[in-house]
Swiss-Prot record:
Name under which the protein is recorded: Protein JASON
Transmembrane parts of this sequence: none
Phenotypic effect of disruption: Diploid pollen grains (dyads of spores instead of tetrads) due to defective meiosis II. Abnormal spindle orientation at meiosis II.
Keyword Ligase: no
Additional note from the record: Diploid male spores in jason mutants give rise to viable diploid pollen grains and spontaneous triploid plants in the next generation.
Covalent S-S links between cysteines: none
GO BP terms: male meiosis II; microsporogenesis; regulation of DNA-templated transcription
Disordered as annotated region, ranges: 226-250
Native organism: Arabidopsis thaliana
Amino acid sequence: MRRLLMNRNLSPLCRSVLRFIDLSVCRAMACFLDCFRARDNRSTSNLVSHSSLANSRKAQDSQNDLSALFLSEEKSASSPCLDKERFDLDSIHIDKGLRDEARFLKACGTIPETPIEIRKASQKLSPQHSGSSHFHSWISSSSSMGSRLAESSTPMKACEEVGRPSFTSEQTASSCVIDVRDNARISSASSDGTEVESVGTAIKGELDRTARPTFTAGKNKSVRFECDLDQSNSSNSSENGSSRKPEMGGKICFTVSSPNPTPLKLSDEMQTPGTIYPANMESGGRGRPRIRSQFVHSVSNIMENASLYKVYKDSHEGLDYEEQIEAETPSSETYGEKVEESSDEKLSKFEASFSPWLNQINENIAALNERTPGVGVITPGDRPIIGLVAAQWIENEQTEISPKMWDGNGIPNSTTKYKEDQKVSWHATPFEVRLEKALSEEGGQSLFPQRKLEVMMEEVEGDTDISQLHHSVQPNSVVSF
């Protein structure tokens, strides 16, 4: 178009027509483009406005839901006498996710209980106080609840699960139901995470047969009961060998296995380390619970018991001897018989307690004798002579050895013929006495006389000749036969 307008050969009319067409087309295109640009801007602005409105609406909805939840709880806590239908209608609008979140926080331990449960329990504990101004903190409310529970004396529920049926399946770490008549003292110490939670409970008062203290604990929890029921009339006692000991004097004992050995029968004087668990509390009837600590003393070993048995036996033998002496007189015949019977009964009872050990010792001795049959009683001749150490063995004994078997040194020997100690016992007589006696007997002889070796040699030669003669005679006799 512009080239045609620049052409000089065209007439002015044609140029004016072309200019009009050009301007109209340009304006039409500009209007068309302006329309498209306006639509794009409007669409982007509309999208941004819609997203912001949606976010704000969601935030408002969540805030409205949270406010509705807390408002409904406040209303139900401030006015406990309202009908449950109103609470159900308000809870319909509460989002299910909020309930799940509350359950999750309750299970994790972030909050001990939901606000409505705390308020319901506190309303039942103290109905005269109403309003939400008393519940600024959950911790303070729980502590006040524990103090009010300790002060109250009527049967009550410490923690109650209220609301929908979905809440009935949950059991919190501090929920417990106790039914007592006089007083209840509960001291609990709980810790978060993996720490061990311990609950110590001491109950004083009469316990119903139907009422049983139950504890529904959380992760790790140890409960210790120490109860001892004193009953005037004990009846309906069922024995359970795995978890109960025999009942003595109307007392029920629930025991647990202990590291130390304990006797089979228990009495009031004995103390055992068993922890008492009221597993079958309803069979105990009514009585006054008593708390007492129990310990155990280990049984002495075999050697100590053997020594005690020996001492007891010696004393018993001395007592029997005295009883026999007293029984010789006619006035003490009946008394001696009674004492003998009682002492025999005591000895039999005492020996019965040691019977397994004594039988085992006798069996060991018999087995040892079977293994070594050649070992017998050591005679005085077989006793070793160790100088003056063995002097006490033959101090009061008379020597049976012939005088020919003694030598000059006092040692028995059949090859010598000295007579120095024929009448003197070497081991019993001191050296000074023997020396004086030897000097007095010898008189003017020398202190150390020489031995007669020639006589000994002659006797040895004579013995050899006689033996040779016997050997020579025997073969001839054999040949003659």
